Regions:
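Catalytic cores of NTP-dependent nucleotidyl/adenyl transfer enzymes across multiple folds
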Residues: 1-48, 52-64, 68-100
Length: 103
């Protein structure tokens, strides 16, 4: 039930908990079969209003590597060096964008 989980986590973003963005990133990054397989999970519900709202919210929170979503991911991981922080922020942005482009 990955789609409802991602819907719930996306709805929770904005409550000041960096873990929500991290959980979204983790699921996308580590989904068995990759982001394409994860996107297939959305096929039966891609036109539902709640999924459209999720896409809009994720697109806003992860609009660039410097937006709130990637920043929250890096903050949650409590990284020390700037290079690692920038790499994680970039990866979080790219992972979410890959999913958004497929659903």
């Amino acid at each position: 039930a990955v789609v409802p989980y991602l819907i719930m986590k996306t709805a929770a973003m904005g409550r000041g908990k960096a873990k929500d963005a991290y959980d979204i990133y983790f699921i996308i990054k580590h989904y068995i079969g990759g982001v394409r397989e994860l996107a297939k999970e959305f096929e039966p519900v891609r036109d539902k209003n709640i999924v459209i709202e999720v896409k809009d919210k994720l697109a806003g929170k992860f609009a660039s590597e410097n937006h709130a979503g990637p920043k929250d991911v890096a903050d949650f991981m409590d990284l020390e060096d700037e290079e690692s922080i920038e790499m994680i922020k970039r990866d979080a942005y790219e992972q979410v964008q890959a999913l958004l482009n497929l659903i």
